[in-house]
Amino acid sequence: MYILVWKKGQQIKTFHTLDEAAQFKAASNIDEAQVFSVTDAPDISASGGSNEARNRRRLMYLTNSTNPEECNPQFVGEMARVATIQNREIGARGFLMYSCRFLLQVIEETVEDPDSLFAKFSPEPRHERWIELDNGPCTGRMYGDWNMKDSHLDSITTHPAMLTILFQMARSISCLWSYLQKSERIMLLFGKDPGAQRPEPMRVVVTFTYLVDFGSMLSIPNLTEQAAEVLTTFVDGCVKNVEGSGGSIAKFTTGICMAQWPINRTVEALTAIQQISEDLAQLRSQQAPGSAVSLMYSQAGLHYGRGMLCNAGSRKSDFTLLDFINTTSRIATLANKLKTPLLFHSFDVRCLLGDEMREEIEGAGMHQVKGRDKPVGVYQFPGPELDVEMVLRQKVEQFTPGRFRCQMPVVEYEALPIWQRPPIVDDTPKGYPRPRTMPGYGGRQRSDSLVDRLIMIAKLAGPSVSATGDTTLTTLTYISQATRKPMSRLHLSALMGTATRRNAQQSITGTLLDVNGLFGQTLEGPKVAVVMYLSIRQDARQTDVTTVHMAPLQERVCPSEWTLTSATEEMLATFPPLQDVLSQLAKSCTSLETYVRSTVGYLTAGNNRRNLMPVSCGVVMLATDIGSFTSLTEESSLTEVWMICNTFIDACTSAVCQEGGEVIKRIGDCVTAYFPGNNAESAVAAAQELFTFCRQLREAFVDVVDVRGCVSCGVGLDYSQVVMAQCGSLGLTEYVVAGVSARVMEVDAMTREVGYAIGVTEPYVTDRLSPQSRDHGIVPTPQAIELPCYGIAGEQLELDVDSIKRGIKALHAARSGEMPVTEPEEALRLFRVSPGRVRHGDTGRRSNSAQGKRSIQVR
C-alpha cells in the first residue's frame, strides 16, 4: 500500500499501486508531495506466534440514541470511559462519531471478534435501530487506538455543508432501512453493487399467507377508509410470528405475505402460520363494533423445493424468490377452494416434519393447479371444513361502521390541498440527457449540463420561474459521483463559475461539497426552483444521483452565495476518517434508493414515516409475467432462471419508467406497476414496448438452444381505486399500493386465452384512451365473459401461446438429446377475432350492465 502525503501532512490518501498515486498527483496538480510505501506487519499473539493468518474485518454501524436530548458530551464521555477499557482489552481499534440523535461507530478487529462484539452490545438500552453499514475484510489497520474524544460533529468540522450532508444521510438510511427485508439489508447496506451479485441457490420452505377476500373490502367505502389499519395489523402480525420463529419475510404485497424458512425449521414454519391465524381470531374477538379488523381471516399455502434469493434488475432492483414461488401461490389459492386454513404441497415437506406432527396430517388428494402438467398431491391438518370466504362475505354484507373511527383513515387524494398531496409517480429522468444543439448558443454542440438546462427552462418560463409557482422555502440534499476522477481544479473552477451564475438567477443558495469525486450538494430556495432542480438533476458529469433529503425550511442556513467547497483541506485534516465515513454512507444511500421506490424516498425525506397520510386515488394498474414460466424453468438451471428474470424485469422496469409509471412489486417473474389515472395511453405504450422486446428477444435466439428464445409475456391493464398507505410498525414497514390487484392479474392471465398480448378492461381503461385508440386500436374479446375486456389490435401484438409451448418442449427435448415430438398444426381457435376497425357502437362493446360480474376475484 502506498500513501500520498501533501500540504505539509494535512492531506493523506492511500493507493494500491505506485502508478495510481502518480496519476492522482498529476491530475490534481499537486506540486509538493511525498509517497510512502507501507507494509502491514502481522500481529503477535499472546503466545508469541504470528497472527498473520487471522484476517481483520471492519465493522461500521449506525444507531439512534434512545433519548436524543441526553446525547451530550457528558453522556458520550461516560460511554467512552467504559468502551475504551473494554476495547483496549480485546485489541479493537476505531472511533465513534455522534451528532444529536445519531451515533456512528467503526471497529477494526479479527474475523470473530466484531460479530460477537456487535451481538454483545446490540441489546444496549441506550441505543435503538442498529444498522450495519459495513462488515467486511480490511487489509490492515486504518485507525489508531480507540477514540471517543472530541467526536461530536461540531468538534470535527463547523462547515454547514458537511454537517448537513452527514446528518441527512444518517437520517435517510435510518428511515429507509426499515423498508428492506433482513436478507436485503445484509447486502445492500454494505454498499455492494446490486448488479454484480450472483444468485444464491438454496432449499427453503416458502409460505404464502393472504387475507381472505381483501379485495372486497376495497370495494365498500366504509371499509376502504380502514384499509390502512387492516394492512398495518396484518404486516405486524406476520413480522412478529415469522421472524420470531426463525424465518424471514420475502415480500409483502396487497394482503399477501411471502416468507421463507430454512429446511430444518419446517415445523416452526407451520407453527408460525397457525399462530398468525390464531392471533387474527383473537383480534377479531377484541374489536369494537364497526372495526374492519373484525373481518380479517387468513389462509396459507406451504411448499418446499429448490429456489434462489437473487437480485433481479439493475435500473430499479429487487430481490425475488424463484422458481417454485408460483406453485406456492397456487397452493394457497387451492386452500381456499378446499376450505382449509393451511395446505402444503410436496411429499418432502411431510418428511421434514417431526414424528408427532407427521402423524397428525392427512392427505387432501390430487389436484390440478395452473402451471403444472400433472396433478399435485397436497396435505392438510384434520379439522372441520370452514368456508372462510362465505363467512366473510356474510359479515361484509352485514357490516356497519357505526360510530367507530379508525386511527389511520384513508383520505381522497383529490380532496387534499395541492401542497399536501404526496407524489404518485417519480418524474425524474433515470438516464443521461442527450447532447443537443440549442438555438441561442451559436448552433454549436453543447454538453447539456444541469445548470444549462435550468437556465433554458427559466428563460422559457419568463423572467422568473418562481413567479407562478410555489415559493415555499425548501431545502434539498443529494449526493452523486463524478464520472471523471479525480476532479482537477480546472474542472471544479469551471463548474463553480457556471453554477454560481445560474443559481443566482433562481434565488438558489447552497453549497456543493467535493470529497475526492464524491459530490454532496445542499440547496435552499423556492420550492418550484428546487423541484425543477430535482427533476433535471442528472447530467453527464455525475452518476448515481441520490436524493437524501427534501423538506420545507423556515429560514436559510447556507451562505448568501452559492459556493463550492473541496473537502481536502481543513475538514479532513481535523478528522481523517471523515472521508471514509462519508464514502460509506453515500454507498448505502445509493443502494437504498435503487431498491426502495422513488416515491417512497421522497415521502420519507424529511418526514416522519409514521405520519404519512393514507390516500385513495384512481390509477391504471399494469400486471405482466413470463408466459409458461413454470414449464420453462422446471428443467432449466437456476442461473438460467435468474438470467431470464433479470432480462425481463429490466425490460419491464425500463418501459414503465420511460412512460411515466411506477413499479410496485417484482414477485418471481411477475411485475406490477401503475400509471396516473389520466395516463392510460402511456400504460398501453409501455405494454407494447415490453411485448416488442420479448418478441425481438425470441427472434434473436431462434437458431440457438437458449431459454431466452422462449420468453414471452402478456400484459393486463385495469383502472381501479387504490389506497396508498404506510403499514407496519415492528421494525419492518411497507408502503403499500392496495387495490383490486386480482382483477388486473386476471386480465393478464386472460391474454393467453384470447390470443392478444395486451388486454384492457372495459369500460375502465377503454374510456380513458384517446378517441383514435378506441375506434381503431382495440378489438373485442367475446370469450372474456366474467370480466369484459378488449385486446390491443395489431398483427405484431397477437399472442400465439401454443407456438410458445411447442418451442419450450422442443428446447427441453433438444437439451436432453431426444427428438422433439412433431404435432399436427392445430386449427385456429374459434374465438380468435382478427384485428380490425371496431367502433364505439359495435356489438362487441360491453354495456355497463355487465359490471356486476367484475367483482369476482380470481387469484
From Swiss-Prot:
SMART domains: BLUF. Residues 426-445, 835-859 are annotated as: Disordered. PROSITE patterns: BLUF, GUANYLATE_CYCLASE_2. One of its GO terms (cellular component) is motile cilium. Residues 56-149, 473-565 form the BLUF domain. Residues 620-748 form the Guanylate cyclase domain. Residues 846-859 have a biased composition (Polar residues). The keyword Repeat applies. It comes from the Eukaryota. GO terms for biological process: cyclic nucleotide biosynthetic process. It is found in: Cell projection, Cilium, Flagellum. InterPro entries: A/G_cyclase, Acylphosphatase-like_dom_sf, Adenylyl/Guanylyl_Cyclase_3/4, BLUF_domain, Nucleotide_cyclase. CDD domains: CHD (cd07302). Keywords: Cell projection, Cilium, Flagellum, Repeat. Belongs to the adenylyl cyclase class-4/guanylyl cyclase family. The 1224-5/1F strain is deficient in phototaxis. It is not known if this is due to defective adenylate cyclase activity or defective BLUF domains in this protein. Heterotetramer of two alpha and two beta subunits. This is Photoactivated adenylate cyclase subunit beta-like protein 1224-5/1F. It comes from Euglena gracilis. The lineage of its organism: Eukaryota, Discoba, Euglenozoa, Euglenida, Spirocuta.
